[in-house]
């Protein structure tokens, strides 16, 4: 009786798959059909292997699937999953060939709802940045030497102990004021803002620390509220925010004048060690000494240069005497030449008169006129030269050292007769001679003082 069923013995061998080939084909199909995907569920059967890999089951009310997260990915997770945690995983759907089971190969894991929180974080950050709350030009510099530091945190927080320990170590002279507030939980954001506003209103401190230790994103969420950011920006005191660990960033960090990676780092930024104070003061003092020395050196050089240009009174008198002698010689020469010329002209006219007797009266008149002119010229020239001579004599008299002494000045000379011109040439208990207008005196030096201008 014929049948429509194929005969198994007649199926070509080339169309038969091995189990391994089947699993490989299914694995490729799964990977192509399901790229990296976010999947939400509850963790159960969590195991952390000695190799560092994580094995767990991800389930919901109706189904479950096995998952693995290898050590290379697990080490970057900021929390350790626990039984019953609600999480979201980013994973590839793969097939574990040895057992033929499909599973999730997890690339990243986060607590459930973190995605929504992160979106809210980005939206608020963009809004406040657009308003200019994060503008670097708005941020205030920290005081160079803070005497009082305010702390906004929980009295029970480990961060407070870290801050106080750091302040005691670095700057025990600094006064610390605590503005207590819850740092997580319902209503914490409003209370944090109130504590910051209180510190600003009291104006008791030079800088304000807003801090808490590390935790999950939910634990730190109070510092991502808009009211906290706006209160920080409106605070009249420079604010340092140190929340969580170095990798944690909150809205408060962006609003602060300075962001510190940890509470301890915030305390270090706020408190300048006393040794650093002293070092800075020493540096400033050294700079002032060097500047003063340079100024004194420049003044001394200028004084030395001016002293070399200054001519002594005796040299000035000698120079004026030589000039006076020169003028006297020129005056005598100037009077002799016109007189000789006049005498020559007179003799010439006399000869002409003698040869021309009929014109004697005319010649006499000419001679008289020439004589008159000659006399006037000689008187004018002589008066001018005498006036210059009197002026030079008056100048010479003004430079006479005796006249200077008569005006109340004195000339001081040492034991060797050298004139003393500067205080540096004198020493206490030295005997000197003081020359006055009408005599001299021997005196002893009690002390020497210099006048700096």
Swiss-Prot record:
Q: Which UniProt keywords apply?
A: Cytoplasm, Exonuclease, Hydrolase, Nuclease
Q: What class of enzyme is it?
A: hydrolase
Q: What does this protein do?
A: Bidirectionally degrades single-stranded DNA into large acid-insoluble oligonucleotides, which are then degraded further into small acid-soluble oligonucleotides.
Which reactions are catalysed by this chain?
Exonucleolytic cleavage in either 5'- to 3'- or 3'- to 5'-direction to yield nucleoside 5'-phosphates
Q: Name one GO molecular function term.
A: exodeoxyribonuclease VII activity
Q: What is the lineage of its organism?
A: Bacteria, Pseudomonadati, Pseudomonadota, Betaproteobacteria, Burkholderiales
Under PANTHER family, the record lists: EXODEOXYRIBONUCLEASE 7 LARGE SUBUNIT (PTHR30008:SF0)
Write the protein's name.
Answer: Exodeoxyribonuclease 7 large subunit
Subunit-level organization: Heterooligomer composed of large and small subunits.
The species this protein belongs to is Herminiimonas arsenicoxydans
GO BP, one example?
DNA catabolic process
| Highest taxon, organism lineage | Bacteria
Q: Which EC number applies?
A: 3.1.11.6
């Amino acid at each position: 009786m014929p049948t429509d069923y194929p005969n198994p013995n007649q199926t070509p061998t080339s169309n038969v798959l091995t189990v391994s080939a089947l699993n490989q084909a299914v694995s490729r199909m799964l990977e192509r059909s399901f790229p990296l995907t976010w999947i939400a569920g509850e963790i159960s059967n969590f195991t952390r292997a000695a190799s560092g890999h994580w094995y767990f089951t991800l389930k919901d009310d109706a189904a479950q699937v096995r998952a693995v997260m290898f050590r290379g990915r697990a080490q970057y997770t900021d929390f350790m999953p626990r039984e019953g945690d609600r999480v979201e995983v980013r994973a590839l759907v793969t097939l574990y060939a040895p057992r033929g089971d499909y599973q999730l190969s997890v690339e990243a894991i986060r607590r459930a709802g973190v995605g929504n929180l992160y979106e809210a974080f980005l939206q608020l950050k963009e809004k406040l940045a657009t308003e200019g709350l994060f503008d670097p030009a708005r941020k205030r510099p920290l005081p160079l030497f803070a005497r009082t530091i305010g702390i906004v945190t929980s009295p029970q927080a480990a961060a407070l102990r870290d801050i106080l320990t750091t302040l005691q170590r670095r700057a025990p002279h600094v006064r610390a004021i605590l503005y207590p507030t819850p740092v997580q939980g319902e209503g914490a954001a409003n209370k944090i803002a109130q504590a910051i506003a209180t510190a600003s209103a009291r104006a008791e401190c030079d800088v304000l620390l807003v801090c808490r230790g590390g935790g999950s994103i939910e634990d730190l969420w109070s510092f991502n509220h808009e009211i906290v950011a706006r209160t920080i920006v409106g605070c009249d005191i420079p604010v340092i925010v140190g929340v969580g660990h170095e990798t944690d960033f909150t809205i408060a960090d962006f609003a602060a004048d300075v962001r510190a990676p940890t509470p301890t780092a915030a305390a270090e930024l706020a408190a300048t060690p006393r040794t650093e104070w002293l070092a800075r003061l020493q540096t400033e003092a050294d700079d002032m000494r060097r500047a003063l020395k340079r100024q004194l050196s420049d003044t001394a050089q200028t004084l030395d240069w001016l002293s070399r240009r200054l001519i002594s009174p005796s040299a000035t008198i000698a120079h004026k005497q030589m000039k006076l002698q020169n003028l006297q010689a020129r005056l005598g020469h100037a009077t002799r030449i016109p007189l000789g010329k006049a005498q020559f002209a007179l003799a010439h006219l006399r000869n002409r008169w003698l040869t021309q007797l009929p014109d004697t009266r005319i010649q006499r008149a000419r001679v008289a006129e020439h004589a008159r002119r000659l006399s006037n010229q000689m008187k004018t020239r002589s008066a001018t030269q005498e006036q210059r001579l009197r002026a030079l004599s008056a100048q010479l008299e003004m430079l006479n050292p005796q006249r200077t002494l008569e005006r109340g000045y004195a000339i001081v000379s040492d034991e060797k007769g050298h004139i003393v011109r500067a205080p540096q040439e004198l020493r206490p208990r030295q005997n000197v001679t003081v020359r006055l207008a009408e005599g001299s005196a021997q005196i002893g030096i009690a002390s020497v003082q210099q006048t700096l201008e």
